[in-house]
Amino acid sequence: MESQQLSNYPHISHGSACASVTSKEVHTNQDPLDVSASKIQEYDKASTKANSQQTTTPASSAVPENPHHASPQPASVPPPQNGPYPQQCMMTQNQANPSGWSFYGHPSMIPYTPYQMSPMYFPPGPQSQFPQYPSSVGTPLSTPSPESGNTFTDSSSADSDMTSTKKYVRPPPMLTSPNDFPNWVKTYIKFLQNSNLGGIIPTVNGKPVRQITDDELTFLYNTFQIFAPSQFLPTWVKDILSVDYTDIMKILSKSIEKMQSDTQEANDIVTLANLQYNGSTPADAFETKVTNIIDRLNNNGIHINNKVACQLIMRGLSGEYKFLRYTRHRHLNMTVAELFLDIHAIYEEQQGSRNSKPNYRRNPSDEKNDSRSYTNTTKPKVIARNPQKTNNSKSKTARAHNVSTSNNSPSTDNDSISKSTTEPIQLNNKHDLHLGQKLTESTVNHTNHSDDELPGHLLLDSGASRTLIRSAHHIHSASSNPDINVVDAQKRNIPINAIGDLQFHFQDNTKTSIKVLHTPNIAYDLLSLNELAAVDITACFTKNVLERSDGTVLAPIVKYGDFYWVSKKYLLPSNISVPTINNVHTSESTRKYPYPFIHRMLAHANAQTIRYSLKNNTITYFNESDVDWSSAIDYQCPDCLIGKSTKHRHIKGSRLKYQNSYEPFQYLHTDIFGPVHNLPKSAPSYFISFTDETTKFRWVYPLHDRREDSILDVFTTILAFIKNQFQASVLVIQMDRGSEYTNRTLHKFLEKNGITPCYTTTADSRAHGVAERLNRTLLDDCRTQLQCSGLPNHLWFSAIEFSTIVRNSLASPKSKKSARQHAGLAGLDISTLLPFGQPVIVNDHNPNSKIHPRGIPGYALHPSRNSYGYIIYLPSLKKTVDTTNYVILQGKESRLDQFNYDALTFDEDLNRLTASYQSFIASNEIQQSDDLNIESDHDFQSDIELHPEQPRNVLSKAVSPTDSTPPSTHTEDSKRVSKTNIRAPREVDPNISESNILPSKKRSSTPQISDIESTGSGGMHRLDVPLLAPMSQSNTHESSHASKSKDFRHSDSYSDNETNHTNVPISSTGGTNNKTVPQTSEQETEKRIIHRSPSIDTSSSESNSLHHVVPIKTSDTCPKENTEESIIADLPLPDLPPEPPTELSDSFKELPPINSHQTNSSLGGIGDSNAYTTINSKKRSLEDNETEIKVSRDTWNTKNMRSLEPPRSKKRIHLIAAVKAVKSIKPIRTTLRYDEAITYNKDIKEKEKYIQAYHKEVNQLLKMKTWDTDRYYDRKEIDPKRVINSMFIFNRKRGGTHKARFVARGDIQHPDTYDPGMQSNTVHHYALMTSLSLASDNNYYITQLDISSAYLYADIKEELYIRPPPHLGMNDKLIRLKKSLYGLKQSGANWYETIKSYLIKQCGMEEVRGWSCVFKNSQVTICLFVDDMILFSKDLNANKKIITTLKKQYDTKIINLGESDNEIQYDILGLEIKYQRGKYMKLGMENSLTEKIPKLNVPLNPKGRKLSAPGQPGLYIDQQELELEEDDYKMKVHEMQKLIGLASYVGYKFRFDLLYYINTLAQHILFPSKQVLDMTYELIQFIWNTRDKQLIWHKSKPVKPTNKLVVISDASYGNQPYYKSQIGNIYLLNGKVIGGKSTKASLTCTSTTEAEIHAISESVPLLNNLSHLVQELNKKPITKGLLTDSKSTISIIISNNEEKFRNRFFGTKAMRLRDEVSGNHLHVCYIETKKNIADVMTKPLPIKTFKLLTNKWIH
């Protein structure tokens, strides 16, 4: 019998966790979580009615065929076997008797969980009728016969619930995890329901339907314990059981409450996310549904804002409502109510069109009750299903579709409304019957029933034009009809097997027939309301019946789920079999190869290619006629769509509709071009262009960066320009999706001004063709203009500006008009236009001297925006001016690098072309009036520095004293000027900017005072030899006549009797070959220095025209002999390749350029000839500037306009922008607790090692008598603030040693228990590096020691108590400390005082003043770091003597004695050192990094391209506000702490080249954006790639027996928002890099010079301290040097002028720096920027520069 039972249930596998079940589970659409008692009663009633209609099982059957039980029965439960059941078992009638309870009397027979053995356990009573476990698993089970009782009366009493033992139900599975408890409770509740205990299950309010009996409570308690072991119960369940072991009812009540709450929220979210609406249901019902869901979610704490709700609604719109997605997506503040207004409007429009069509014939009385109309929309040859539902639920979108295509699970649209205005007949499950129906499941095997289908019923569909059925047993007069073409709602073909009649026999004995199509490939049997209407049958959804026009009711309509159904019992069966239907006239296409199959076989080629290949017999075996091509045209291969995806095609001329929709200047296109590399820093690197859609008018604006505020200013400017000049308002701006356009600032600006941003789609540049093509055209013109004119590249934007002016004036071939004509502007007057780069002579209206020439050669660029003048580039003055005072030089050659002024010819054409304009200017000029001169030289000046590489077209030749120009030279020079070939430099200094030609709105009230030391931004020439250098007395014999007549053009600032001076030759870039500077007595020189000293505001501190170090010497700082060679010698500076000499023509060799002595101060250029311009002339320039500022017109971005004063510094490019405040980094725990290392450690081997370390530490504590073992104190007796918590920490050292440490919780130590004044000192890293450097130079022996348990040697003075270690088992006792336990606040200080006293008294050492933990005597130097000691000495025996003395008191271990003459490897405080005495020392961390970096979980790329530098210039951090979840934010901050912590450790140890990047990234630890994390990953990747790099020290071989200590300083001026200046210093001892520092400036600097002064002032204190340390450790003389690449800073340091600093913020710092330099005998020297290795500490550098500056000292 048992085998028969098992054979009847093949779905129950052997060994499954479920017991065998003789009854099928009831399939229902009821929510499985809805298990309240009220619904259980309905469920039982439905089951009883359904079973009463089933046939009984024959006696010979082992298992009844009826899957439903006659009445509720107690369940028979098999015993658990600590896992899956080994065999299926069922309870018999005899095993369910009361005697079976005896097993519960012996708990040993059942595998109880621990809490079952509690005193609360009790067995059931003797009268209990509940089942029990069988006595043996293998007992045969008998099956009761059907006659033994298969029907019972339905009763709700407890007694009647237990009157039968015939039910066999599936027990719940064993609970195996706390996370599975919610699902397990569902099965357990179902188990109770099947066991006739549904009445005791708590309802929603937490109360059961009836009172539970004692036996039921016992059964409930015991089964819960058996199937829910205590170790797998959730915490909240355990809490309930800890109060009352039997309170299972409370657990069930809370579980049901949780399930119902979670289910409702989940269902609402899913429904809202899958909304679908196409107008098939009333709009008001759809709105009610959506608003109800949103309200419920908001009430439950899930807030859905308007934006999200509108997006979800619009995503589900289809049909005529779909266009709302595109018309509404631009409205950011749209509400749900506004959206529904549009939906209602469309719905009402649809209803109006439907009412015009014929409706179903209905009873007039019904039309009064039912206001809805059901339109008969018949579609020939198309079956679409859209049933009318009073609950406004939307029909399935693919009900009449091929089931195989949709995996037998048609998608359900979730815009159904749960309730309707009229309540129809509703079936909650298949067993609910109404109107006397007898629901009998059809015996026909339907194909692919859908989950939500009501078996045995037809689905009413108002949208279907034909009736379709899957079963052939109801089709009469079947015949094939291959001409029928039926498609589903998705336009897919549905194969039809046959056509026939569907005959109905209704309740009034009337018979009706309609046409029906047979197909097995649909999800539902569809009954078309259209065909019923053709036979005078109408569906009345008010009464939910099918009726005739006279009101005769034919059949009821049943609502099940979201749809309406009619029972198949009204259908008359036929005698036609299914095979007959399927084989009648099979379509010819079924014998052909389907096209999708051929398409896939032939590598997914297109249909045209396949068909052509078959025609030409390139593919054999079958012909073209063998393939079914019917679906080839419409077939869409999903794999092809994915694999062959391309961008959409842009249709030519598709944008024309916008031209008709918008007026001029309402629709703009914009785009940004750039950056342009290898340009001066002050020149614009970008430009932004705008194009009007209608007129094609263009605008261009220069940009220095792409920051959002710069873009915003340009947008503000052009919008105001269009509004004021053209009286138009911009409505739409089209742009790409660059961050400069999509940022929040610009978005808010556009929204505020009512402008709609129109963005291109992702990776679709062709959609932005107007702007892209304009940029390409302008760049083509730019390159051509620069090539033709020969002008330098930094004037590239002037070429863009010129091209824009011309292009706006040229006619378009399409429109036959120019952009200016479309805009209503006059055509371009070509008489006002000059060729780009046309040579001209500009009039100097304010020369320095009356005898100086009045003309300056220049090159015309483009007409001015702000005046009637022309923008002209003056190469001699290195600036551009806006003027009308120019004369055209007509010549055959106009290229700048080819123009020959000796071959000038008069060009009649050009002169005739510009004659009218020149006459117009002449007629309007007023002679001898400077006030009316429209030239604005100061406004538009652009001063140029020297390029790092010497310009090949600029004469810069130093003149020796013997080549001084005699007095007669001046006359000769004057004669040669007319023959000089004037050429503009091809390469210019980094601070040039053609954007300077436009005025600035923001002007400084104080003019920039230029001076001889200006770095180029002030328009001055640099000097090859500083004026402050000592002057040779050998030049006193030179004549001063030439000096007076040539150089001192403005000498009114000096007394008239200053005549006794000589000339010192000075070379200046672009100056004369022979220039002299007057030399006077020492007093006179000092007096002039006061006037000539550079302004503190002077900008860039570099002078790249110099290629050698220039020391600045004073009588106090330098010895008489030249010390520059001794200071620079042996420094690891890069080797620069020699620069090739500049090739000049013969004419250039003969005479200097014009600008050598024809500069004019009013134009802003001050060369050597006017280096001594007086203060009065500068004041006059200021007045002129202020006058011109008032009349200037500003028409574009103020941030892109150059200031009146020359730029004070070069533009600094940071790697990232700094934040305003940075909090301290939270330390990261790297140790393990006791429970982690021992208690719960699953690694047995590691656990054993930690146990050994634990016992070792305990023994050491006892050995050192750490606490008082004579007495244990009660916790209540001691003051709580003197009680210190203690713990064991475990860690694994890099060498593999497992270590345990017993520590005190000093972090919660009370302040009264220690002295805050005591400090624990360790050796400073600079002191260690200094000691190592001296050891390398002096062949010292290096010995490394370790003192075990160092802190325990120090006694503790305070009265402190701790809890004993865990192994003592005295948790309620305290012990008093006697030693300084690790972790106490005072332990470090106590140990320092202890070891310091011992070293001084017993070892004869003394501590170096100012350097804690550095001890020395005449032979040995000791560096102390807690318990680690490093000994340095010339004699190894001296080290051994110290070791012997230490061992007398402390447990001292020798880590490395250092006695070998070969290479010795050390691991000193994290540094891996390789040392060979007398040769070299290498410092690195390769092994440590190889171990630590992979543990950081950073995505490393070991085989990919290695990074060549830690960062590149030009990267900025996006300053937008982060939007992160709290947990995600904390996780990322924690990750940043780990990464930056490791990088900082490596950087400050020896990788000083990374300090800038580490410092700037550390400022963003609390701003962990994706960009910051990516940059951090790149830094870690670079450290990983270069982990084998080492700091290399070779033994120095000094020429003199002295130590040389040098600091190289640098600073980068932060002149951008969110930036502060960055300072950096590198310290070198005898040519070895021993330390570095990179940090933000603590003071706000207003210029580069201020930043340089601040950097130097920060380096001097440490330099002096290191000098003292070196002198203490090594008694040799010491030379101290300070190197900087800022000549202006050097001038300030040694200047005696103090007046100029009184009003300066940093004046005090500068004057203090002077005193320190003078008092500490510092040699201040100049170093070239190219050789300044401190550059890596202040700014990100290009790869080539970074390598050049670091490869000498770290590799």
Curated annotation (Swiss-Prot):
The gene is TY1B-LR1. InterPro entries: Aspartic_peptidase_AS, DNA/RNA_pol_sf, Integrase_cat-core, Retrotran_Ty1/copia-like, RNaseH-like_sf, RNaseH_sf, RVT_2, TYA. Residues 1038-1053 have a biased composition (Basic and acidic residues). The record marks H401, N402, N582, N583, A1217, A1218 as: Cleavage. Residues 299-401 are annotated as: RNA-binding. Residues 1610-1752 form the RNase H Ty1/copia-type domain. A motif (Bipartite nuclear localization signal) lies at residues 1178-1212. Initially, virus-like particles (VLPs) are composed of the structural unprocessed proteins Gag and Gag-Pol, and also contain the host initiator methionine tRNA (tRNA(i)-Met) which serves as a primer for minus-strand DNA synthesis, and a dimer of genomic Ty RNA. Processing of the polyproteins occurs within the particle and proceeds by an ordered pathway, called maturation. First, the protease (PR) is released by autocatalytic cleavage of the Gag-Pol polyprotein yielding capsid protein p45 and a Pol-p154 precursor protein. GO terms for cellular component: cytoplasm; nucleus. The active site is at D461 (for protease activity). Mg(2+) 3 binds at D1610, E1652, D1685. The C-terminal RNA-binding region of CA is sufficient for all its nucleocapsid-like chaperone activities. Integrase core domain contains the D-x(n)-D-x(35)-E motif, named for the phylogenetically conserved glutamic acid and aspartic acid residues and the invariant 35 amino acid spacing between the second and third acidic residues. Each acidic residue of the D,D(35)E motif is independently essential for the 3'-processing and strand transfer activities of purified integrase protein. Retrotransposons are mobile genetic entities that are able to replicate via an RNA intermediate and a reverse transcription step. In contrast to retroviruses, retrotransposons are non-infectious, lack an envelope and remain intracellular. Ty1 retrotransposons belong to the copia elements (pseudoviridae). Keywords: Aspartyl protease, ATP-binding, Cytoplasm, DNA integration, DNA recombination, DNA-binding, DNA-directed DNA polymerase, Endonuclease, Hydrolase, Magnesium, Metal-binding, Multifunctional enzyme, Nuclease, Nucleotide-binding, Nucleotidyltransferase, Nucleus, Protease, RNA-binding, RNA-directed DNA polymerase, Transferase, Transposable element, Transposition, Viral release from host cell, Virion maturation, Zinc, Zinc-finger. The keyword Repeat does not apply. Residues 583-640 are annotated as: Integrase-type zinc finger-like. Residues 1338-1476 form the Reverse transcriptase Ty1/copia-type domain. Mg(2+) 2 binds at D1346, D1427, D1428. This is Transposon Ty1-LR1 Gag-Pol polyprotein. Residues 1-10, 48-60, 127-152, 1005-1015, 1054-1082, 1095-1106 have a biased composition (Polar residues).
